[in-house]
Swiss-Prot record:
InterPro entries: BRCT_dom (IPR001357), BRCT_dom_sf (IPR036420), DisA/LigA_HHH (IPR041663), DNA_ligase (IPR001679), DNA_ligase_AS (IPR018239), DNA_ligase_CS (IPR033136), DNAligase_adenylation (IPR013839), DNAligase_N (IPR013840). One of its GO terms (cellular component) is cytosol. This is DNA ligase. Belongs to the NAD-dependent DNA ligase family. LigA subfamily. Residues 593-670 form the BRCT domain. SMART domains: BRCT (SM00292), HhH1 (SM00278), LIGANc (SM00532). It catalyses: NAD(+) + (deoxyribonucleotide)n-3'-hydroxyl + 5'-phospho-(deoxyribonucleotide)m = (deoxyribonucleotide)n+m + AMP + beta-nicotinamide D-nucleotide. GO terms for molecular function: DNA binding; DNA ligase (NAD+) activity; metal ion binding. NAD(+) binds at D33, A34, E35, Y36, D37, S82, L83, E114, R137, E174, K291, K315. DNA ligase that catalyzes the formation of phosphodiester linkages between 5'-phosphoryl and 3'-hydroxyl groups in double-stranded DNA using NAD as a coenzyme and as the energy source for the reaction. It is essential for DNA replication and repair of damaged DNA.
Amino acid sequence: MSESVHQRLEELKESLHYHAVRYYVEDNPEIPDAEYDRLMRELLEIEAQHPDLVTVDSPSQRVGGKPLSEFSQVTHEVPMLSLDNAFDDSELDSFHKRAQDRIGGESIKQYCCEPKLDGLAVSLLYENGILVQAATRGDGTTGENITENVRTINAIPLKLRGDDWPARLEVRGEVFMPKAGFEKLNELARQKGEKVFVNPRNAAAGSLRQLDSRITASRPLSFYAYSVGVVQGADLAASHYERFLQIKSWGLPMCPETKRVDSLADVKTYYQHILQRRDALPYEIDGVVIKIDDIAVQERLGFVARAPRWAIAYKFPAQEEITTLNEVEFQVGRTGAITPVAKLEPVFVGGVTVSNATLHNADEIERLQVKIGDQVVIRRAGDVIPQVVSVIKERRPETARDIIFPTQCPVCGSHVERIEGEAVTRCTGGLVCQAQRKQALKHFVSRKALDVDGLGDKVIEQLVDREMVETPADLFKLSAGVLTVLERMGPKSAQNIVNALEKSKLTTLPRFLYSLGIREVGEATAANLAQHFKSLEAIQAATEEQLIAVQDIGVVVAKHITTFFEEEQNQAVVQDLLVQGIHWPEVSAPEQGAELPLEGKTVVLTGTLSQLGRTEAKEALQSLGAKVTGSVSKKTDILFAGENAGSKLAKAQELGIEIKTEQDLLELIN
């Protein structure tokens, strides 16, 4: 190999890196696409003739390589934190005041503001200017190694520009799919008859988590940096915004809407400006991220419950759109509740295409005065089920029809009833009703109930449709041979379900009570019942007066419990479950004189836990003597906060409630 070949290869790499930054980062290309393609072809030809010269930072590595069998795990040297949320100006004001109070009342003026991109957070690690590792955020402590996939994203430099970067530099940012690329990707999928993506965020996440990086390379992904993690070998600027400029000078893209402002009032102006421009921006956003600009102040403020005290996400209000209500269907739930569902002309709102929305109940239909054929306003906020919020009556067509609530169950034909004082109309068919049967069985095997692994919704639906099961006890009478008649059910999968059912027979009394699906008996109520009565027999025999003596049980819930156990059909199901081998350890009372660490404390769990399931955490807290509730109030003693803790955490901070982490909970348990 001649020296000239090696030299030409380096020239091509430098040139391609330079022009990639001009195109993808600065949006200011110097050469036509055809010239860039010519340079890339020349590079590929040289590397094909001299494979020993191929390096990880070569532009040729963006095409993707051999598929992986699985992603390896990466432990973040500096945890990747989530953000607290603000939903209005008063919550933003509270954030500002808390920060100033914590640093002794000093004035905080400058903030760095940027759109909150709706994508996937990633960490990029550069060593000596070369991209050596990329990882997802995961649970904030551990993520997945997606280096091969990230190398295919043109907006991310494989080699940093310049030479004044730190020897080790970790850049955090968001991988996203621009709106235009998302539309093209879905259009191509439609032409091929393939499944389309629901929204750009799902498309970006799905593309980034492909085991075959060649698929990722074919997807229109982009990237904007938003912060740094590990920094070794050089000092960065003392301003968050100026750090952005440093990162950009090394070839990493930053969102062009990022701005430094000089007052809290300017922050609010920026928020309104971005909110108004939201639909015009080429990418999906769901709010604005606001960070105190002074790095020294950031360091003084520190972190709380896996979120920084110096930053907050100011979320946009729920998105609304107008569409046509074409029809109304009535769905039957586990407890017989009949819910009217609006069938809509599909409309893109809140980041997804919506074709169904809840109308809640007959009272809501009356309140809205909505009719079939009306133009309606629907709202979708985050993961909340879309709902009809108003009717544009001046647009009502002459053909509009009244919505008639059924007098018979739309599934089984049983009589429906509405108890005085309740908003819900219910089917009286019980387990005779196929819809109720399906939902009851799904609830019985769910994670918080008997937790039967592998027995998903589609399997339950087939079992009921084929009349193979009627009650929960029938599940334990199934054999692997019988299960193999179901669609997509091989012998191994069938045996796994049988094994999982056998394993689930050992449970706890609270889980068993919860699995029965008694109206308004959730996890906490089931735990309180078990702790108070100690046995199933005592609960079955309890009067309403005795039940009301249990913590958090009132007249209505007590009536539901006694009614459930008085019904002969329910008695038979419970007895059959016990005959099939469902059992649990004896519920023991705390030892006399034993002091539980959380005795008498009211606690709330919020956010995502990395090492404990939510049910497991609740049970652990209750075993420590705590009363676990679902909302924060002045009566709350402790808030245990995991990742992505939002409004509950903010409210707890405002009320001065003690805040603990998942690690604190683990230490209490151990």
